[in-house]
């Protein structure tokens, strides 16, 4: 009789990256963003493989302390036991040195925190050690494609890091004079896009609705009239945004909070967003073969402007499984629960092949 085969041992390898972050006192906004960045595969690898060490820029304001503490924290999140939780207190010390607005234990806005953090990390691993003087030469005589390339080159002569490689795209702004028809264009780098949420009387609001509202042609009239450089006068104009260069990582900010001076309020509209195959070609400023994105992380805000709580839903770059990160508590979740009316920041990764310049 043939010998019985020994059962194949189940893999004992633990999927790492499922470690929680302790709440130091209203620091859930920080924990949510840190977990989203920890699951950004290329940024994670940059920290885990110590690639950042060769890029550290000692000319930076913080002398590389912020990047070093961030990398240390990412390494802890990926080497600790899934049942453990890590204290981000050393990291918090450095981020509040870099951005004093985060001193103390008040609740903060996660999108603002992300902006400050990425800016700080970028500065400390900027490959440009000595920035050239800003070039004031006008590029208005050039065709748009060439103008955008030149503007991007000028940007990279001053800002060039592994962080900006991942997160920075280029936005095109077109201003058309209704008197003479002249169209002026500007090309600006962006780290994220803040999307208005449309008010609908019926039917669900989708992420594409938000993007279409963001890129919709706006009329600038009355006090908003700009000066047309051809008419040499303030004229009624139309303004439109489009995406010139798609970033590797696209962060979409759903504008849930009003900026009213007297009393802030929050929109709890459910926005339906795709988990994969978000095709953004219709928002490209030039013909584009590929601009398809897949979701891998969401920063959520529950509650009101007066009292709320941040969590993160992240898809592991190793197992492709979704987990909920609620400060020190990490639990598996179904992908069908990722969409909710608490979604605030959406992290998408560009699927290959890339259409970037």
From Swiss-Prot:
What catalytic reaction does the record list? Thiol-dependent hydrolysis of ester, thioester, amide, peptide and isopeptide bonds formed by the C-terminal Gly of ubiquitin (a 76-residue protein attached to proteins as an intracellular targeting signal)
- Xref: PROSITE patterns: USP_1, USP_2, USP_3
The USP domain is annotated at 19-351
Q: What is its main location?
A: cytoplasm
Tell me a GO cellular component.
Answer: cytoplasm
Keywords for this entry? Biological rhythms, Cytoplasm, Hydrolase, Metal-binding, Protease, Thiol protease, Ubl conjugation pathway, Zinc
Q: What is its EC number?
A: 3.4.19.12
| Residue positions binding Zn(2+) | 177, 180, 228, 231
Active-site positions, per UniProt? 28 (nucleophile), 309 (proton acceptor)
Q: Where in the cell is it found?
A: Cytoplasm; Cytoplasm, Perinuclear region
Task: Please report a single Pfam family linked to this protein.
Answer: UCH
Biological process, per Gene Ontology: protein deubiquitination; proteolysis; rhythmic process
KW Methyltransferase (keyword) present: no
**Family according to the record:** Belongs to the peptidase C19 family. USP2 subfamily.
Quaternary data: Homooligomer.
What name appears for this protein in its UniProt entry?
Answer: Ubiquitin carboxyl-terminal hydrolase 2
The protein's organism comes out as Gallus gallus
As recorded in Swiss-Prot or TrEMBL, the protein's gene is named USP2
